[in-house]
């Protein structure tokens, strides 16, 4: 492959370091985040890389459903105040940052990763967020920084009891508590797995008239699909060469 692109889920990285340290001690915390990222860059030897941050403004998902992530505590103010210093420190080790207004980092990363993979490059996402798993079937790789290993397709399919390409429909049906997405009433994890193993996908289920759980629920389940699926068409206005690493 001509290039390996490292796509860093910024808040996933820094919040885990923050929690592991029991808080942020300004310079020591910034240094720990920088050292952690630099170690991974040394291990993976990417040719390109970018640290992607969430927009500070409400995203399109919040507009679609105002309950989205409403169950989460806000990012601690002390951590928010350290973000400019983190961006500066990351730039000092040669990797720049990116934020796209009204989009979460996940959508920006998914767009970048899909673009790299479709052009025969190797996209490596640095994150522990399960919502990236559906990208595995597109040739995208996911690296678990704190366990220092790549996520394996077979491992994910065994964990969920489903194929990778069924995960979006699984979360749409059963919900996703971490993002406060409720899913369909009366459909838990076991029922969602059973429905998908029998029918394959939501589209097939909606074409039937004998699945009581989905009766009169087409609009709701499609809304849930929108919420859990990562966008891969965010208008970025950037070029891969902007993220070339030395």
Where are the model-predicted features located?
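Short, intrinsically disordered, charge-balanced linker/junction segments flanking boundaries
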Residues: 242-246
């Amino acid at each position: 492959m001509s290039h390996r692109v490292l796509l860093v889920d910024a808040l996933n990285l820094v919040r885990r370091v923050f929690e592991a340290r029991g808080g942020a001690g300004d310079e020591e915390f910034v240094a720990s985040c920088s050292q952690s990222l630099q170690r991974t860059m040394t291990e993976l030897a990417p040719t390109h890389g970018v640290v992607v941050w969430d927009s500070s403004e409400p995203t399109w998902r919040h507009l679609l459903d105002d309950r989205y992530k409403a169950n989460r505590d806000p990012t601690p103010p002390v951590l928010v105040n350290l973000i400019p210093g983190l961006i500066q420190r990351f730039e000092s080790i040669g990797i720049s940052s990116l934020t796209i207004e009204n989009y979460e980092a996940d959508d920006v990363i998914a767009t970048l990763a899909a673009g790299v993979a479709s052009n025969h490059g190797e996209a490596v996402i640095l994150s522990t967020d399960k919502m990236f798993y559906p990208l595995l079937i597109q040739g995208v790789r996911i690296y678990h920084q704190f366990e220092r290993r790549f996520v394996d397709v077979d491992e994910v399919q065994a964990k969920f009891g489903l194929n990778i390409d069924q995960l979006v429909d699984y979360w749409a049906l059963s919900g996703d508590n971490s993002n406060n997405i409720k899913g369909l009433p009366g459909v838990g994890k076991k029922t969602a797995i059973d429905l998908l193993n029998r029918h394959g996908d939501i589209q097939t289920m909606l074409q039937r008239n004998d699945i009581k759980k989905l009766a009169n629920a087409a609009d709701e389940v499609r809304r849930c699909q929108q919420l859990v699926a990562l966008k891969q068409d965010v208008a970025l206005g950037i070029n891969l060469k902007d993220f070339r690493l030395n």
